[in-house]
């Protein structure tokens, strides 16, 4: 294979999956085949999409009810020749799912890149090992928290929040994805002030915390804004990838003048991936493509919290981010939304050690504030790594957290 193989979930009311697959393969490549003269067929053969797999799935009554018709469901795979497209994500996505995405009854499940094609993508600049080296933390999951309620607040408020989270033992603090450039907390001022706070905490407590600042602005201003952030001392860039596009992420990741990790936020991705019947699968969108395009971290809904993905999907995202690949470094999985300390054993069991535990309300909502919230999570992480039940841990901050949010993991075995 020198091109790309696309895997689709299709729904067909004509009940002929092979015919539908062939129509897709032709429609996204040369347009027609059987009516072409033999000589022209020979000329175009190298450009034709080839159906390589058709698998019928069991009938699904909920699908029939939603579509208001009886359909046959199937998984199909089509190989697209590298000759047909340039080696970039806009061309690849348009080739494999461009006009087909308008069908409303087809879901792009996966894309399998040839080795030749993979060479054109950067992958993470730092990856899991590089991030761990920045923090000098190699033996446990990382802990991340979020600035809360920053809109309309000034730098002083930001500094207080940041200090409390860092003292609590948080490894990374990120901006809220809806915090854009503004007069009260402009980008460079956030970075400079934040770095001062984090350096002070490090000198006093010996704990290093990184700050992920939100990279925003018009598309053609992003590189300049990113370079300003780097010059101001930014540790990590948070980026709302799907508000801009995967190719924009790639252009940032490839730029040598932006030598910092990039954290991909999933905002807007639900518009592409939420349906089970059409769109793009979450594992492909938030896993494989983000990693290939250069994200060092990928945030996605956890299977446990307030905006939950199905566990199978969340684990598939993580697999794409962390599986061995000779071409790419591994990206950190960041299962998010509604996480509190009682979920830590679940996260460690399901995602392993190389994961970022991301909490907002689970840290800020602690009765002892963000310091107490961070310490509760760190106690939960330490106990989990020792395979010790959380309710047996002698830590007042963790006990308070479990009283507020519960301990759903009390019977979890690692």
Curated annotation (Swiss-Prot):
Which EC numbers characterise this protein's activity in its record?
5.3.2.5
* Alphabetically ordered keywords of this record: Amino-acid biosynthesis, Isomerase, Magnesium, Metal-binding, Methionine biosynthesis
The answer to whether keyword Ribonucleoprotein applies is no
Which segments cross the bilayer? none
- Kindly give the InterPro entries that the UniProt entry links to this protein: Diketo-Methiopentyl-P_enolase, RuBisCO, RuBisCO_lsu_C, RuBisCO_lsu_C_sf, RuBisCO_lsu_fd_N, RuBisCO_lsu_N_sf
Task: Please provide the Gene Ontology terms (biological process) for this protein.
Answer: carbon fixation; L-methionine salvage from methylthioadenosine
Q: Which cysteines are joined by disulfide bonds?
A: none
Give the matching Pfam families. Answer: RuBisCO_large, RuBisCO_large_N
Q: Where does Mg(2+) bind?
A: 174, 176-177
Q: Give the record's pathway.
A: Amino-acid biosynthesis; L-methionine biosynthesis via salvage pathway; L-methionine from S-methyl-5-thio-alpha-D-ribose 1-phosphate: step 3/6
Alphabetized SUPFAM superfamilies for the sequence:
RuBisCo, C-terminal domain (SSF51649), RuBisCO, large subunit, small (N-terminal) domain (SSF54966)
Gene3D superfamilies, A to Z:
Ribulose bisphosphate carboxylase, large subunit, C-terminal domain, RuBisCO large subunit, N-terminal domain
Question: Which free-text remark accompanies the cofactor?
Answer: Binds 1 Mg(2+) ion per subunit.
Q: Which residues form a coiled coil?
A: none
**What are the protein's GO molecular function terms?**
2,3-diketo-5-methylthiopentyl-1-phosphate enolase activity; magnesium ion binding; ribulose-bisphosphate carboxylase activity
Family named by the database record: Belongs to the RuBisCO large chain family. Type IV subfamily.
Job description of the protein? Catalyzes the enolization of 2,3-diketo-5-methylthiopentyl-1-phosphate (DK-MTP-1-P) into 2-hydroxy-3-keto-5-methylthiopentenyl-1-phosphate (HK-MTPenyl-1-P).
Subunit text = Homodimer.
| PANTHER family to which the protein is assigned, alphabetical | RIBULOSE BISPHOSPHATE CARBOXYLASE, RIBULOSE BISPHOSPHATE CARBOXYLASE LARGE CHAIN
How is this protein named in the record? Answer: 2,3-diketo-5-methylthiopentyl-1-phosphate enolase
Q: Which organism is it from?
A: Bacillus cereus (strain Q1)
């Amino acid at each position: 294979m020198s091109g790309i193989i696309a895997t689709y979930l299709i729904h067909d009311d004509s009940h002929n999956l092979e015919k539908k697959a062939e129509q897709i393969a032709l429609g996204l490549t040369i347009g027609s085949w059987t009516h072409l003269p033999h000589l022209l067929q020979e000329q175009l053969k190298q450009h034709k999409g080839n159906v390589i797999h058709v698998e019928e799935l069991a009938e699904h009554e909920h699908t029939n009810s939603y579509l208001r018709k009886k359909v046959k469901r199937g998984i199909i795979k089509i190989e697209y020749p590298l000759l047909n497209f340039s080696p970039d994500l806009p061309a690849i996505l348009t080739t494999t799912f461009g006009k087909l995405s308008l069908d409303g009854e087809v879901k792009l499940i996966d894309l399998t890149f040839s080795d030749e094609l993979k060479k054109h993508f950067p992958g993470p600049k730092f990856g899991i090992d590089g991030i761990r080296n920045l923090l000098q933390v190699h033996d446990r999951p990382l802990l991340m928290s979020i600035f809360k309620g920053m809109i309309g607040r000034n730098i002083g408020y930001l500094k207080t929040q940041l200090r409390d989270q860092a003292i609590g033992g948080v490894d990374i603090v990120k901006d809220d994805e809806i915090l854009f450039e503004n007069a009260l907390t402009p980008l460079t001022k956030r970075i400079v002030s934040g770095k001062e706070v984090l350096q002070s905490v490090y000198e006093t407590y010996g704990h290093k915390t990184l700050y992920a600042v939100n990279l925003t602005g018009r598309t053609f201003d992003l590189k300049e804004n990113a370079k300003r952030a780097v010059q101001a001392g930014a540790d990590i860039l948070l980026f709302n990838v799907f508000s801009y596009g995967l190719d924009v992420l790639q252009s940032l990741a490839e730029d040598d003048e932006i030598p910092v990790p990039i954290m991909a936020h999933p905002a807007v991705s639900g518009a592409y991936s939420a349906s089970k019947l059409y769109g793009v699968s979450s594992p492909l969108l938030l896993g494989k493509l983000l990693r290939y395009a250069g994200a060092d971290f990928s945030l996605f809904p956890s299977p446990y919290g307030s905006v939950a993905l199905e566990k199978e999907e969340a684990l598939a995202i993580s697999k794409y981010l962390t599986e061995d690949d000779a071409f790419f470094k591994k990206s950190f999985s960041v299962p998010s939304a509604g996480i509190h300390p009682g979920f830590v054993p679940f996260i460690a069991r399901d995602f392993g050690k190389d994961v970022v535990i991301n909490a907002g309300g689970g840290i800020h909502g602690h009765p002892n504030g963000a310091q107490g919230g961070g310490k509760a999570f760190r106690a939960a992480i330490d106990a989990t790594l020792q395979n010790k039940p959380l309710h047996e841990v002698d830590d007042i901050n963790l006990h308070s957290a479990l009283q507020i949010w519960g301990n759903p993991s009390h019977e979890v075995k690692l």
